[in-house]
């Protein structure tokens, strides 16, 4: 992909979107679709913050140029031309990143890549809001991932051993206060995962981070973070795919397929199409479990008129 024209210095008013823009830069080559929507989120958020002062107008204008250039380069990519596909792409990507970090956390493997993955997952869930309101599940994952990143970072920075797995989340105000301090020191370059709890903030690199590895075939969390399947096995620098559990087919679905008297609204067809798109996106990641779940939702909706 051709290099994009650089942006001018970030105005102080846009501090809240600096990490989303960094994530966009990190994904320009790895996943241009993710990079595009990160910039779109930054653009929309920046417009709401300040679109009138000269420095902000100049910055937003250059950011718009980047968006137009990216859209032209991506051409007829369905994840750009169809919102349903784009939303599914981002959700799957963010949840897989969350799952990788959560599995490392549950196994007690605390390292910079895991912290970065938690925080980046939370940023990408922010980005999903360009498609509309977040689901309750995404809101929970975002809160948990952002808090975990800050909690583990602070523990390692202070020479403490973090508690593995789900722990009591602090009050929202505490999360907000610690978020910027923790995020500012997150790694921005690939580092080798380590099973050691030792951590030296002074060794944190400053280049662009591109090394988060997402395990193929891992399935996204089904419910809340506390219900993500536990990771097992010894600490290792090699990320192992999570074994997939294909959900059982609801027998009741087969009894309704032949009835043919269900009255479906245009909204029902749109939701069914959305579930099928989600399933297709999940299969791109070899995520059979999520694909089956979404296909079952579509089938139930089309045969019963209910979700």
Swiss-Prot record:
Keywords: Acetylation, Cytoplasm, Endosome, Membrane, Protein transport, Transport. The keyword Cell division does not apply. Residues 181-206 have a biased composition (Low complexity). Residues 198-307 are annotated as: Interaction with VPS4B. Residues 2-186 are annotated as: Interaction with IST1. Residues 2-75 are annotated as: Interaction with CHMP5. Residues 179-233 are annotated as: Disordered. The modification N-acetylalanine is found at residue 2. Its main location: cytoplasm. GO terms for biological process: ESCRT III complex disassembly; late endosome to vacuole transport via multivesicular body sorting pathway; macroautophagy; multivesicular body assembly; multivesicular body sorting pathway; protein transport. GO terms for cellular component: cytosol; endosome membrane; extracellular exosome; intracellular membrane-bounded organelle; multivesicular body; nucleoplasm. It is a peripheral membrane protein. It is found in: Cytoplasm; Endosome membrane. Involved in the endosomal multivesicular bodies (MVB) pathway. MVBs contain intraluminal vesicles (ILVs) that are generated by invagination and scission from the limiting membrane of the endosome and mostly are delivered to lysosomes enabling degradation of membrane proteins, such as stimulated growth factor receptors, lysosomal enzymes and lipids. Thought to be a cofactor of VPS4A/B, which catalyzes disassembles membrane-associated ESCRT-III assemblies. Involved in the sorting and down-regulation of EGFR. Involved in HIV-1 budding. Interacts with VPS4B. Interacts with CHMP1B. Interacts with CHMP2A; the interaction probably involves the open conformation of (polymerized) CHMP2A. Interacts with CHMP3. Interacts with CHMP5; the interaction involves soluble CHMP5. Interacts with IST1. Belongs to the VTA1 family. This is Vacuolar protein sorting-associated protein VTA1 homolog. It comes from Homo sapiens.
């Amino acid at each position: 992909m051709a290099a994009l024209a650089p942006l001018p210095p970030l105005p102080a008013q846009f501090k809240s979107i600096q990490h989303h823009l960094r994530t966009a830069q990190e994904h320009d080559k790895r996943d241009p679709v993710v990079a595009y929507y990160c910039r779109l989120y930054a653009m929309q958020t920046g417009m709401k913050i300040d679109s009138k002062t000269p420095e902000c107008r100049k910055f937003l204008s250059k950011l718009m140029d980047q968006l137009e250039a990216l859209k032209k380069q991506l051409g007829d990519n369905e994840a750009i031309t169809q919102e349903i596909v784009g939303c599914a792409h981002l959700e799957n990507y963010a949840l897989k990143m969350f799952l990788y970090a959560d599995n490392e956390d549950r196994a007690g493997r605390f390292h910079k890549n895991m912290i970065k993955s938690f925080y980046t997952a939370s940023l990408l869930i922010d980005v999903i809001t360009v498609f509309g309101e977040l689901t309750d599940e995404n809101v929970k994952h975002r809160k948990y991932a952002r808090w975990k990143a800050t909690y583990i970072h602070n523990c390692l920075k202070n020479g403490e051993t973090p508690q593995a797995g789900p722990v009591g989340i602090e009050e929202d105000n505490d999360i907000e206060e610690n978020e910027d301090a923790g995020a500012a020191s997150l790694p921005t370059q690939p580092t080798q995962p380590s099973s050691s709890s030792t951590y030296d903030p002074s060794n944190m690199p400053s280049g662009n981070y591109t090394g988060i590895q997402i395990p193929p075939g891992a399935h996204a969390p089904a419910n809340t973070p506390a219900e993500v399947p536990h990771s097992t096995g010894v600490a290792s620098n090699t990320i192992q795919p999570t074994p997939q559990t294909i959900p059982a087919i609801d027998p009741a679905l087969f009894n309704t397929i032949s009835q043919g008297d269900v009255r479906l609204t245009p909204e029902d067809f749109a939701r069914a199409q959305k579930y099928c798109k989600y399933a297709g996106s999940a299969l791109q990641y070899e995520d059979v479990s999520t694909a089956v779940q979404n296909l079952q939702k579509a089938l139930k909706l089309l045969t019963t008129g209910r979700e």
